[in-house]
Design a protein with these regions (language model features):
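Noncatalytic luminal/extracellular "stalk/propeptide" segments of secretory-pathway proteins
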Residues: 26-56, 76, 80-213
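Bacterial N-terminal signal peptides
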Residues: 5-16
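Metal-dependent peptidase/peptidase-like ectodomains
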Residues: 133-137, 151, 156, 161, ...
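N-terminal capping segment at the start of a domain
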Residues: 49-89, 115, 125, 249, ...
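Short helix-loop-beta-strand segments that form the rim/entrance of peptidase-like active sites
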Residues: 73, 262, 351-377
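His/Asp/Glu-rich mid-to-C-terminal helical/loop segments that flank catalytic regions of hydrolases
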Residues: 266-270, 280, 351, 470-545
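Soluble metallo-hydrolase cores and metallopeptidase-like ectodomains found primarily
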Residues: 55-57, 132-139, 145-171, 257-336, ...
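Second-shell loop/turn segments in exported
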Residues: 58-66, 80-91, 156-164, 170-172, ...
Length: 545
C-alpha cells in the first residue's frame, strides 16, 4: 500500500507542474474546436437521395417534424419541471402521469401497465459542510435510496476506509467508524481533464501521476463490495455517513448511481476536488470534520409501470411497429440524455404520425419503459407479457445513447432486413439520411431495451446517435441537464423515426426473421440461440442497489 507516499509524491509533482506553468505565461487561447463529424468522409451510400422525395406522406412528415416541432418544448417541461425519474419513485409516477396527459392532448390513447413492484424512495434536500480545519461548503449529491439524518444535522470526523483483504480485517476495523464519516473510494490525484495533462504536463509528470493513480485506485477498488453487508455493517457500527466519488473525466462531472438497498445509511457522491481534499486531510491527520443533512423517505415496495401509447392499425392491427425508449433515469441531474432524449424522440415521432398519418396499416406502439437502469426490467416484462406483440412485430426502433443526430443503424439479428432499412431510407430526404451509415448484423446485446425484443428473435433496430462524448460527459452524471440537449438533433431524430415507422407500417411485406448464423457475442465457443431471454426482475428483492 502506497497511500502516504502517494501524497508526498503528489506534492512534488504538483510543484513541478506549477513551476512549468509559471515559466509559460500567456500560452494563448484554447484551440478552436473543429467539427469532426459534420458529414462522414466516405462516399454517400446509394440510399442517400440525390433528389427530393416524392412520397406525399414523407413530405408532410418532414414539414410537421421540422417546421412545427414540439420536441424542445416537451423536453423542457419534462426535465426542468419534473426532473429525474428513478424507478419506483414518486417523481417517476409524476412523470408518467405527465406522459398520459400529454398524449391525451395529442389525441393518442395511452395507458400504464404494471409489471411488478420496486422499493420506492423520495428524495429531499441534502447538504454537507467541512467544519474543521476550516469551513467550506462541499459539492455533494445524495445517492438514490440513501438513508437520512432524521431531520437534523449530523457531524463527525472524517476517516478513510481501511483497504481490508478479508472479513476478519474488516471486522477488526469496524469499531473505529463510530461517529465518523467514512471515505470509501479512491480519490483522483488531479481533477484536470486528460486533454490538459497531455497538452501541458511534462512527460515525466504525466507518467508519475498515471502510475500513482493506478496504484491508488487498485488499493481501494471494490472495497465496499468485499463484504456484501459493508454499508449496513458500517451503519450498525455507528458511522454517520459514507462518502464516495466517481469522477467522469471532466472537471465538475461525476457519475451518480444509487446506494445499496436497505442500508438506511446517508450516502453521498462528493465532487472530485472536495473529495480529494477530504482524503488528503484525513490521511495527513489534519483533523477534518464534516456535518451533513440528508432528507429522504423510504416508501416500501410500490407498483411500477411502463407507459404504452398506441395508434391502432387500420388493416393489420395484429402486426406492430414499436417505438422504444426507456423513461427511467438516475438522479445525478435531470436524466436528459439518458434517456429523456430517446423518450421525447419517440413521443414527438408519434405526435407527428398522429397529425399526418392517423390511420396506419399496422398498429403503432410507443413503449416508455421503466426499470431499464436496473436491468431492462420494464421492457423485458413487456415482451414476456405480450407474446402477441413479439410475434407480430414488423420492427422495433430503439434510441438510448444521447442527444446527437442518428448516424448509425443496422438490421440486428436479421441480415435480410439490412436492404429493407436501406430501401426505407432511400425514400427519405437526404438531409436526414446523409449522416447515417448502415452496419451489418449484430448480436442480441444487453445495453438497452432493443435486447428485450432481440432475445426473442424479433426484429429490433437501434438508432445510434452521434456521441457528444456521451459516456463521459452526460451518461449517468450530475451534468445531464436540459442544456446538454441539442434540440435541432432531437427534431431531426423524431422526424427520421416518424418516417421509419410510417414506411415500416406501410411495407407490403413482413420483415425477415431469418437469423444471422452464428449469432455474434457470448464467450468463446458459446453457441447463442433464440429465444434466450432471462427472467426480468419484477421486484427489488435481489437488486443490490
Amino acid at each position: 500500500m502506497r497511500t502516504f507516499s502517494v501524497f508526498a509524491l503528489l506534492l512534488a509533482a504538483s510543484a513541478s507542474v506549477s513551476a512549468s506553468a509559471a515559466a509559460q505565461p500567456g500560452r494563448g487561447p484554447a484551440p478552436v474546436a473543429k467539427n469532426m463529424q459534420a458529414l462522414p468522409v466516405d462516399p454517400a451510400p446509394s440510399y442517400v437521395r440525390k433528389d427530393a422525395p416524392t412520397d406525399p406522406v414523407i413530405l408532410k412528415l418532414w414539414e410537421e417534424g421540422m417546421q412545427r416541432s414540439q420536441a424542445g418544448r416537451l423536453a423542457q417541461q419534462l426535465l426542468d419541471s419534473i426532473g429525474p425519474r428513478l424507478t419506483g419513485s414518486p417523481n417517476m409516477n409524476r412523470a408518467q402521469d405527465w406522459l398520459l396527459a400529454t398524449y391525451k392532448q395529442f389525441g393518442v390513447s395511452a395507458r400504464k401497465e404494471q409489471y411488478g413492484t420496486w422499493n420506492s424512495w423520495k428524495r429531499g434536500v441534502a447538504f454537507a459542510q467541512l467544519t474543521a480545519p476550516r469551513v467550506k461548503a462541499l459539492e455533494v449529491n445524495m445517492l438514490s435510496w440513501s438513508g437520512n439524518t432524521a431531520g437534523k444535522w449530523a457531524e463527525g470526523a472524517v476517516v478513510v476506509v481501511k483497504p481490508y483483504q478479508s472479513p476478519e480485517e474488516f471486522a477488526a476495523w469496524l469499531p473505529s467508524v463510530k461517529g465518523k464519516i467514512v471515505l470509501a473510494s479512491a480519490p483522483r490525484l488531479t481533477c484536470r481533464p486528460a486533454s490538459q495533462m497531455a497538452e501541458f504536463a511534462m512527460t515525466s509528470t504525466q507518467l508519475s501521476l498515471d502510475s500513482l493513480q493506478r496504484d491508488l485506485s487498485a488499493t481501494y477498488q471494490g472495497v465496499t463490495q468485499r463484504v456484501p453487508t459493508f454499508y449496513s455493517d458500517v451503519k450498525a457500527a455507528g458511522a454517520v455517513a459514507v462518502f464516495e466519488s466517481n469522477y467522469s473525466q471532466y472537471p465538475g462531472v461525476n457519475k451518480i448511481f444509487g446506494s445499496p438497498r436497505n442500508a438506511a445509511l446517508p450516502t453521498f457522491d462528493v465532487g472530485c476536488e472536495d473529495y480529494g481534499m477530504l482524503f488528503r486531510l484525513a490521511q495527513n491527520q489534519q483533523g477534518p470534520k464534516v456535518r451533513v443533512m440528508a432528507e429522504s423517505e423510504a416508501l416500501g415496495d410500490q407498483p411500477v409501470f411502463n407507459v404504452i401509447a398506441e395508434i391502432k392499425g387500420a388493416t393489420k392491427p395484429d402486426e406492430y411497429v414499436v417505438l422504444s425508449a426507456h423513461f427511467d433515469s438516475w438522479e445525478g441531474h435531470s436524466g436528459a440524455t439518458d434517456n429523456a432524449t430517446g423518450s421525447i424522440t419517440m413521443m414527438e415521432a408519434l405526435r407527428i404520425l398522429k397529425t399526418v398519418y392517423p390511420k396506419p396499416s399496422r398498429t403503432i406502439l410507443v413503449g416508455h419503459w421503466s426499470g431499464e437502469e436496473q436491468g431492462l426490467n420494464g421492457s423485458g416484462s413487456f415482451t414476456a407479457d405480450h407474446p402477441e406483440v413479439v410475434k407480430g412485430l414488423q420492427f422495433a426502433f430503439n434510441q438510448d445513447n444521447g442527444t446527437g443526430r442518428v448516424v448509425s443503424t443496422g438490421p440486428g439479428l436479421h441480415p435480410e432486413n439490412g436492404p429493407r432499412l436501406a430501401q426505407y431510407m432511400s425514400q427519405m430526404p437526404s438531409q436526414l439520411t446523409q449522416y447515417i451509415r448502415l452496419s451489418g448484423p449484430s448480436g442480441i446485446g444487453a445495453g438497452s431495451d432493443d435486447a428485450s425484443f432481440r432475445c426473442w428473435g424479433a426484429p429490433a433496430v437501434g438508432l445510434g446517435a452521434l456521441s457528444w462524448d456521451y459516456s463521459n460527459s452526460t451518461w449517468h452524471t450530475n451534468r445531464d441537464a436540459f442544456d446538454k440537449i441539442i434540440v435541432d438533433d432531437l427534431k431531426h431524430n423524431a422526424t427520421l423515426t416518424a418516417m421509419f415507422v410510417y414506411l415500416a407500417s406501410e411495407d407490403a411485406e413482413k420483415s425477415s426473421r431469418v437469423l444471422v448464423d452464428p449469432i455474434p457475442g457470448g464467450r468463446p465457443g458459446q453457441v447463442i440461440t433464440v429465444p434466450s431471454c432471462g427472467k426480468p426482475q419484477r421486484d427489488a428483492s435481489q437488486y443490490r442497489r
